[in-house]
């Protein structure tokens, strides 16, 4: 992971910061709450549920970054894409690796829904809720 992470740092996509375990745990708690909320509204508001499950996964990845002493560079566009690249590097080889690698597809789905004309259906929510949960679980496990 370090060589590819160094490339993200070198390209100005990710930067080193002081690790902050307290902030990381708070962010992971937010992710869990988003997952719970997504489940509650999935049948009546699939698009809203998808935004919540995507944000849950993203915030969990952000929590991993904070715990590890990194963050996405704030001064550049494409922060969520950099988050996806980090997820694939940092979480992509463990038992939840497939879900971490699918985060970028989830990002693109969410963008198409937010900025395009694509409607998210319940089956997409159900499928990606599995991956969002796995990402949150992977980050939780990494905290020890």
What are these regions (language model features)?
Residues 1-144:
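Terminal alpha-helical segments
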């Amino acid at each position: 992971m370090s060589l590819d992470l160094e490339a993200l740092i070198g390209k100005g996509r990710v930067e080193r910061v002081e690790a902050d375990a307290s902030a990381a745990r708070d962010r992971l708690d937010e992710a869990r709450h988003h997952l719970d909320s997504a489940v509650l509204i999935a049948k009546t508001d699939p698009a809203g549920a998808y935004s919540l499950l995507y944000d849950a996964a993203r915030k969990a990845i952000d929590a991993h970054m904070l715990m590890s002493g990194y963050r996405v560079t704030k001064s550049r566009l494409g922060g969520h894409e950099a988050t996806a690249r980090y997820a694939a590097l940092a979480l992509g080889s463990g038992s939840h690796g497939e879900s971490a690698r699918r985060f970028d597809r989830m990002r693109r789905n969410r963008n198409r829904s937010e900025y395009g004309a694509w409607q998210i259906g319940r089956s997409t929510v159900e499928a990606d809720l599995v991956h969002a949960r796995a990402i949150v679980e992977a980050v939780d496990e990494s905290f020890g």
